[in-house]
Structures are given as structure tokens and as C-alpha cells.
């Protein structure tokens, strides 16, 4: 559900997106677009998501899931490790049986501590 930054990986995601195998949810798009340096770049990013990645709706029960997830993370000593956006993305993926594509170690922590979270790093941790 996250976009990649390296050319080879980005091309692979474009091919999978063309097959409708990669989607994007509103929280992920909002987080990605906040890296825009100006209005034109913001518009380009927004168009890219609309053109390439199908929408994956956030579940209506997301806040109950987040409350439960934060409780599990607190028991593991990691309550502050995931942002609200990270948790929204995790629930959206978990509710639909999807894998979170990421470039962020926080999602690996989520996979260790939260049920139904599956993740895949899209770039090497060494890059």
C-alpha cells in the first residue's frame, strides 16, 4: 500500500498496479503527499495515486481496531512506535487481507505484535 522510491522497485510496483495488485488508502496518500515541495508537485502526486493505484477504503471500525492495537503495543512496550497514520494503514490492510508494502521499520514492528498484519519491505534496509 505504500509507494516505493527506487527506480527498479517503482517500476515493479507500476507493473503490479497495472494488474490491480497494489492499492492505496487515503491515510497513505495523505502521508505521501505531505512530502510535496510545492502545489504542482502535490497535484502530480495526487493524480498519480488516482491514475495508478485503486482506492482501498479505510474500514468504519478503524478506531476500535486502533484502540485494541495500541493496547497490544503497550503490553509489548511499544505503544508510541506507530503513528496514527501507520495504524490506519495497518488496519486497512488487515481488514482486507492485504500486505503493507513499506520502507519503514515501524511496519515490521507492527507485524511482530499485531495479528493479521503482513508486511513486505520494498527497498533493502541497507539502501
Swiss-Prot record:
Mg(2+) binds at residue 86. It comes from Mycobacterium tuberculosis (strain CDC 1551 / Oshkosh). Coiled coil: none annotated. Gene3D superfamilies: 5'-nuclease (3.40.50.1010). Its cofactor is Mg(2+). The gene is vapC6. The keyword Cytoplasm does not apply. GO terms for molecular function: magnesium ion binding; RNA nuclease activity. Toxic component of a type II toxin-antitoxin (TA) system. An RNase. The cognate antitoxin is VapB6. Residues 26-120 form the PINc domain. It comes from the Bacteria. Belongs to the PINc/VapC protein family. Its EC number is 3.1.-.-. This is Ribonuclease VapC6. Keywords: Hydrolase, Magnesium, Metal-binding, Nuclease, Toxin-antitoxin system. InterPro entries: Type_II_TA_system_RNase, VapC_family. The keyword Magnesium applies.
